[in-house]
Curated annotation (Swiss-Prot):
Subcellular location: Secreted
Keyword Oxidoreductase annotated: no
Stored SMART domains: SCY
UniProt GO BP: calcium ion transport; cell-cell signaling; cellular response to fibroblast growth factor stimulus; cellular response to interleukin-1; cellular response to tumor necrosis factor; cellular response to type II interferon; cellular response to virus; chemokine (C-C motif) ligand 5 signaling pathway
Protein name, per record: C-C motif chemokine 5
GO annotations of cellular component type: cytoplasm; extracellular space
GO molecular function: CCR1 chemokine receptor binding; CCR5 chemokine receptor binding; chemoattractant activity; chemokine activity; chemokine receptor antagonist activity; phosphatidylinositol-4,5-bisphosphate phospholipase C activity; phospholipase activator activity; protein homodimerization activity
Organism: Mus musculus
Keyword Secreted among UniProt keywords: yes
Family label: Belongs to the intercrine beta (chemokine CC) family.
InterPro entries: Chemokine_b/g/d (IPR039809), Chemokine_CC_CS (IPR000827), Chemokine_IL8-like_dom (IPR001811), Interleukin_8-like_sf (IPR036048)
Length: 91
C-alpha cells in the first residue's frame, strides 16, 4: 500500500507533537507521560516495541517505540493500538 507524501508528512508531524514527556525530572521513575495521542495509526512495520505509561501519569497511554527509536503516544482504547499490541506480543 502506498502512502502519499502529504499523508506521511501529517503522520510524522503528529508523531513529533505527540512525543512523551518525562513523568518527573527529579524522580527515579523514568517512564514518560503523554499529554496528547497520535491521531492516525503508524505504519505497523515502523513499530518495534511498546510500553504503557506510569500510573502516576494523568493520561493512560501506550508508547510505541519506532525502528528509529522515536517514542510516540497512542490511545490504548483505539482498535489499531490494541491490534498492534497483540501483534507485538505474538512476534
Amino acid at each position: 500500500m502506498k502512502i502519499s507524501a502529504a499523508a506521511l508528512t501529517i503522520i510524522l508531524t503528529a508523531a513529533a507533537l505527540c512525543t512523551p514527556a518525562p513523568a518527573s525530572p527529579y524522580g527515579s521513575d523514568t517512564t514518560p507521560c503523554c499529554f496528547a495521542y497520535l491521531s492516525l495509526a503508524l505504519p505497523r512495520a515502523h513499530v518495534k516495541e511498546y510500553f504503557y505509561t506510569s500510573s502516576k501519569c494523568s493520561n493512560l497511554a501506550v508508547v510505541f517505540v519506532t525502528r528509529r527509536n522515536r517514542q510516540v503516544c497512542a490511545n490504548p482504547e483505539k482498535k489499531w493500538v490494541q491490534e498492534y499490541i497483540n501483534y507485538l506480543e505474538m512476534s
